[in-house]
């Protein structure tokens, strides 16, 4: 692992063991996600070694969550019925001690998305909050630019904003970007793995949340789970881009590359540093 200063020793041990545990335990990861990228999220979850399920019916979401190792909530194609179902699922996750990963897609773009995401972080025990700079900045109360589901940036220091929000919410926060920022309020990591093609296809942010959810299903150290997921997904992106002719072939190769990432690859190829 390349570190710029030295990363803490326990991270180096956990990263590899998390990927190994996913392949050995194949945890169920329950998604309540958007209909644009739902198939991509299911496939990337399978590729890392976990098992996806996408149950949305009010009558079964609580039961399904009880069987899962993690719950991923994604507000990319939001409506009022889905909001109610997400809260039912989240309350079940809290009851059974199951980690909740929230991807507040488009928070800051419309009042529905912003208010829903704000309500979720206020009323639910979120384990990992993952979003782009605009989304995280909005939820941190900063001036941010969000166009649709794309980030236009945030005013202020991104690392300080991420760390401050994590401390306030008592959860792990991931701000995605060219350099991903991962913080639980007291420990902060920067990850530089990835490739520009990842920003040229739809769904990579959603897929990253699925990978993080898969990692969070096998450890209670959600900072390590997030860093492992972000780095492993970024490494897969780097490998997929090597022979890709463009974004289309890159997307196909991304799934193959994710399936081939091994437990020691994050240690060998992860570009992670602590701050």
From Swiss-Prot:
It catalyses: 5-(2-hydroxyethyl)-4-methylthiazole + ATP = 4-methyl-5-(2-phosphooxyethyl)-thiazole + ADP + H(+). GO terms for biological process: thiamine biosynthetic process; thiamine diphosphate biosynthetic process. GO terms for molecular function: ATP binding; hydroxyethylthiazole kinase activity; magnesium ion binding. Substrate binds at residues 54, 203. Its cofactor is Mg(2+). Pfam families: HK. InterPro entries: Hyethyz_kinase, Ribokinase-like. It is an enzyme of class 2 (transferase). Keywords: ATP-binding, Kinase, Magnesium, Metal-binding, Nucleotide-binding, Thiamine biosynthesis, Transferase. ATP binds at residues 130, 176. Pathway: Cofactor biosynthesis; thiamine diphosphate biosynthesis; 4-methyl-5-(2-phosphoethyl)-thiazole from 5-(2-hydroxyethyl)-4-methylthiazole: step 1/1. It comes from the Archaea. Belongs to the Thz kinase family. This is Hydroxyethylthiazole kinase. It comes from Methanospirillum hungatei JF-1 (strain ATCC 27890 / DSM 864 / NBRC 100397 / JF-1).
């Amino acid at each position: 692992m390349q570190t710029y200063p030295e990363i803490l020793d326990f991270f180096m041990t956990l990263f590899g063991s998390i990927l190994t545990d996913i392949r050995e335990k194949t945890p169920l990861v329950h998604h309540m996600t958007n209909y644009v990228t739902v198939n991509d999220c299911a496939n990337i979850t399978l590729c890392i070694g976990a098992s996806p399920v996408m149950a949305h019916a009010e009558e079964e979401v609580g039961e399904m969550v009880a069987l899962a190792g993690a719950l991923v909530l994604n507000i990319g194609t939001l409506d009022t019925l889905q909001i109610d179902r997400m809260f039912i699922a989240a309350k079940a996750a809290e009851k059974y001690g199951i980690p909740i990963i929230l991807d507040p897609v488009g928070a800051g773009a419309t009042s529905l998305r912003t208010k829903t995401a704000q309500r979720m972080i206020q009323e639910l025990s979120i384990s990992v909050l993952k979003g782009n700079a605009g989304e995280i900045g909005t939820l941190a109360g900063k001036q941010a630019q969000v166009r649709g589901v794309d980030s236009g940036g945030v005013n202020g220091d991104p690392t300080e904003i991420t760390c401050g929000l994590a401390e306030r919410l008592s959860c792990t926060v991931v701000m995605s970007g060219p350099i991903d920022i991962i913080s639980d309020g007291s420990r902060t990591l920067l990850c530089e793995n990835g490739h520009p093609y990842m920003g040229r296809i739809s769904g990579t942010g959603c897929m990253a949340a699925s990978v993080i959810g898969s990692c969070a299903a096998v450890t209670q150290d959600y900072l390590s789970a997030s860093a492992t997921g972000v780095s492993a997904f970024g490494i897969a992106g780097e490998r997929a881009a090597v022979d890709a002719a463009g974004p289309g072939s890159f997307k196909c190769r991304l799934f193959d590359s994710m399936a081939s990432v091994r437990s020691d690859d994050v240690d060998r190829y992860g570009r992670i540093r602590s701050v």
